[in-house]
């Protein structure tokens, strides 16, 4: 019974946020701190690559940055057909930022909580992409961008026409079209945020459960899972970035 209780307390400790405020007005400070830290790492690393880059033979870090840049640029050019100066930098920012947030999950599960406990902070969840508030906020930001691009390129009348005249062309079915299209429109940011949250939360839980096992089982299970989780970390950042570009491409696409 004592073992079960201690396991329960361990899991509860790792799943409790450092929160300021209550209810709807509460803010998960740990998630916000990690979001800003990973964002700072992104900015400083790319700034370093640009300012310290050599015109001759580039270093390893510069090569890595160039590979990421070209990778994202090729995807954007393939998906987003219109000309827009914002989409490329936006896609690069989303991919690298989400990748860095996800990569925090590859750190030892007790490392950052132990460091924060040493300075008197009892609870600190270090994986921001396992916080549904963070993932849904990012998805909401994408949704607002999609609406902005839609109104900019199609206008209010074009947007309403798009919602009411497809998939059925008969005027009597316009109300049905409106309901179907609104459901589709709203489901995009919801699925975008929940997909990232669900995958990263599940990965975090598996690491926590592995940490509860005997030390010899931890090594046998944590290394294979960490190697597999690298794929999940990269894949989820890639999916979030690609879907963002796809949705923005649909917003400027003429039907």
Swiss-Prot record:
It is found in: Cell inner membrane. GO terms for cellular component: plasma membrane; proton-transporting ATP synthase complex. It holds the Pfam family ATP-synt_A. One of its GO terms (biological process) is proton motive force-driven plasma membrane ATP synthesis. InterPro entries: ATP_syn_F0_a_bact/chloroplast, ATP_synth_F0_asu, ATP_synth_F0_asu_AS, F0_ATP_A_sf. GO terms for molecular function: proton-transporting ATP synthase activity, rotational mechanism. Keywords: ATP synthesis, Cell inner membrane, Cell membrane, CF(0), Hydrogen ion transport, Ion transport, Membrane, Transmembrane, Transmembrane helix, Transport. Signal peptide: none annotated. The chain crosses the membrane at residues 24-44, 86-106, 131-151, 205-225, 226-246. SUPFAM superfamilies: F1F0 ATP synthase subunit A (SSF81336). F-type ATPases have 2 components, CF(1) - the catalytic core - and CF(0) - the membrane proton channel. CF(1) has five subunits: alpha(3), beta(3), gamma(1), delta(1), epsilon(1). CF(0) has three main subunits: a(1), b(2) and c(9-12). The alpha and beta chains form an alternating ring which encloses part of the gamma chain. CF(1) is attached to CF(0) by a central stalk formed by the gamma and epsilon chains, while a peripheral stalk is formed by the delta and b chains. This is ATP synthase subunit a 2.
């Amino acid at each position: 019974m004592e073992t079960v209780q201690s396991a329960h307390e361990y899991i509860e400790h790792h799943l409790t946020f450092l929160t300021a405020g209550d209810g709807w007005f509460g803010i998960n400070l740990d998630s916000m701190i990690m979001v800003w830290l990973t964002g700072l790492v992104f900015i400083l690393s790319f700034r370093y690559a640009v300012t310290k880059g050599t015109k001759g033979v580039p270093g390893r870090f510069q090569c890595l940055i160039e590979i990421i840049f070209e990778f994202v640029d090729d995807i954007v050019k393939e998906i987003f057909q219109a000309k827009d100066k914002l989409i490329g930098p936006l896609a690069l920012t989303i991919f690298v930022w989400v990748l860095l947030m996800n990569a925090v999950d590859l750190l030892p599960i007790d490392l950052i909580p132990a460091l924060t406990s040493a300075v008197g902070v009892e609870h600190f969840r270090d994986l921001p992409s396992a916080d549904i508030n963070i993932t849904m906020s990012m998805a909401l930001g994408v949704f607002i961008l999609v609406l902005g691009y839609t109104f900019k390129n199609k206008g209010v009348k074009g947007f309403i026409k798009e919602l009411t005249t497809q998939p059925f062309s008969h005027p009597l079915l316009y109300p049905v079209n409106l309901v179907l299209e609104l459901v589709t429109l709203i489901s995009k940011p919801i699925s975008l945020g929940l997909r990232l949250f669900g995958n990263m939360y599940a990965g975090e839980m598996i690491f926590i459960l592995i940490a509860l096992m005997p030390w010899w089982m931890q090594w046998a299970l944590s290394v294979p899972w960490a190697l597999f989780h690298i794929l999940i970390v990269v894949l989820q950042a890639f999916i979030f970035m690609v879907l963002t570009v796809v949705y923005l491409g649909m917003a400027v696409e003429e039907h």
